[in-house]
């Protein structure tokens, strides 16, 4: 069984800053693996297939579901999103910290697969700030943004199921917090075999 203490799940509303914080972690911690989501939505401006997402057709995605290729999948804003199994298991076997950027539905399912995973909810201070960010991003219509805000409020109702909360007001401060969380993953007490440690300690002291 691989060490699921090396899993870090980032969730929260679109526009809260998950992608920015994920990129920062990859820059600061060399031995990381970003779990690339597979989606049926169209690429936004500047997005590259295989770098930001694996973009596939709905037919291809459904075939993946039938073959059991996804750890989790969900329909969000009328598009399919999913997490592939093989790359995650390979990264864990190699001792890497695996980072997920997924929605709240995906978080719930992943925690069933990996109960020791650490989860962080990232949000703005309020919905007005989130709305401003989405408008500035310029990739969604006003109607889509309103749907995102409604969905964001629903996601906020799930806060209690997460280990940490980051209110992303000050980006530099948020970077410090997420880096601190990531660095402590492998040092959590639950990750250790207490019996083995105690025996080793006793033998060394004799």
UniProtKB/Swiss-Prot annotation:
It catalyses: GMP + ATP = GDP + ADP. Signal peptide: none annotated. Keywords: ATP-binding, Cytoplasm, Kinase, Nucleotide-binding, Transferase. Its EC number is 2.7.4.8. PANTHER family: GUANYLATE KINASE (PTHR23117:SF13), GUANYLATE KINASE-RELATED (PTHR23117). Essential for recycling GMP and indirectly, cGMP. Belongs to the guanylate kinase family. HAMAP family: Guanylate_kinase. This is Guanylate kinase. The lineage of its organism: Bacteria, Pseudomonadati, Campylobacterota, Epsilonproteobacteria, Campylobacterales. The gene is gmk.
